[in-house]
């Protein structure tokens, strides 16, 4: 998460340096306005992944989480690629079990619906 933020902050994309500076400033302002520590943002990310994983199988490769500021509002943007939607019965079972959101952040749901570490 922090590496994504730093990558966006210092990326070397082609384009106008004025626009790049503007985008960097927006990212910094978003983090300042949200007043979230990196640890709090990471905990929130893990909890969101845990809840969403109860209902759908996620593709951990394309996941993105970041803060964005626009018009005085700060938003948490989450891009979660979905591999498949779980059957309703499986989703209900996972919801009742109350998965632990403090799992591996790149974890993908296993057959039982619990998060497990991705295979190498």
UniProtKB/Swiss-Prot annotation:
Record InterPro entries? MinE, MinE_sf
Q: Where are the transmembrane segments?
A: none
Give the domain of life. Answer: Bacteria
SUPFAM superfamilies (alphabetical)? Cell division protein MinE topological specificity domain
Keyword Cell cycle set for record? yes
Query: A GO BP term, please?
Result: cell division
UniProt entry keywords in alphabetical sequence: Cell cycle, Cell division
Q: Which stretches of sequence are listed as region Disordered?
A: 93-120
The family line of this record is: Belongs to the MinE family.
Reported function:
Prevents the cell division inhibition by proteins MinC and MinD at internal division sites while permitting inhibition at polar sites. This ensures cell division at the proper site by restricting the formation of a division septum at the midpoint of the long axis of the cell.
The name this protein goes by in its record: Cell division topological specificity factor
- Native organism is Synechococcus sp. (strain JA-3-3Ab)
């Amino acid at each position: 998460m922090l590496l994504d933020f730093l990558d966006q902050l210092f990326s070397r994309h082609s384009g106008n340096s004025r626009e790049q500076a503007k985008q960097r400033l927006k990212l910094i302002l978003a983090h300042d306005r949200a007043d979230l520590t990196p640890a709090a943002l990471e905990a929130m990310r893990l909890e969101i992944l845990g809840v969403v994983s109860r209902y759908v199988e996620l593709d951990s490769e394309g996941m993105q989480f970041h803060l964005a500021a626009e018009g005085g509002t700060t938003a948490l943007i989450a891009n979660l690629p979905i591999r498949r939607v779980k059957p309703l019965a499986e989703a209900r079972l996972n919801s009742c079990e109350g998965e632990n959101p403090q799992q591996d952040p790149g974890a993908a749901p296993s057959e039982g619906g619990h998060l497990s570490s991705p295979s190498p």
